[in-house]
Regions:
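Extracytoplasmic copper-binding redox domains, predominantly the cupredoxin/blue-copper superfamily
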Residues: 1-170
């Protein structure tokens, strides 16, 4: 859990649920994820369903790339030192949370979050995030953090108004 001096939490996934159409995806169709210094970088990665990418191993030792999810993307494959593995778009089937681990190095852990909507962002080092181009309406704000779990709260967006939202997680 990475908490800033102001109490903000890094790597919180924030999504607005219930918007039927609107802005284009900000999350790229292609991604890159690295194993570097026996850590997954970045620790939390936002991906799009049916996206594709590459998993790198920048370390001088081999790793085991193992994902666990509820039908989103599951793989268990060794990656040699200084090698890469392609992720095909058909593999990330749907939106959901994907736990990433290395069975050879138990301290290595990370997360992929396959976003359901383009209205999804990841909080920065200070715990801040920004979601733009939200049409006026009533929605659900869905917040997820790996240790603190999930929180859902109501959100009302009025035309032409920016909102500052404080989310409390326990």
């Amino acid at each position: 859990l990475i908490v800033s001096s102001s109490g903000g939490i890094k790597n919180v996934v924030v999504s607005i649920v219930g918007i039927k159409k609107g802005k284009k995806w900000g999350i790229p169709k292609k991604f890159s994820y690295d194993q570097n210094g026996c850590r997954f970088v970045p620790h939390v990665l936002l991906v799009r369903p049916k996206s594709k990418g590459v998993v790198l191993n920048s370390d001088n030792v081999g790793h085991n790339f193992h994902t666990v999810s509820k039908g989103v993307y599951n793989i268990n494959k060794k990656i040699k030192a200084n090698a890469k593995m392609k992720v095909k778009k058909k593999k990330i089937k749907k939106a959901g949370i994907i736990r990433v681990k290395c069975d050879l190095h138990s301290w290595m852990g990370g997360w992929w979050v396959a976003a359901k909507t383009p209205y999804t962002e990841l909080s920065d080092e200070s715990g801040k995030f920004s979601i733009s181009d939200i049409p006026p309406g009533k929605y659900k704000l869905k917040i997820w953090q790996e240790k603190l779990g999930e929180v859902v709260q109501d959100l009302v967006i009025k035309a032409g108004e920016a909102q500052n939202i404080t989310i409390k997680m326990k």
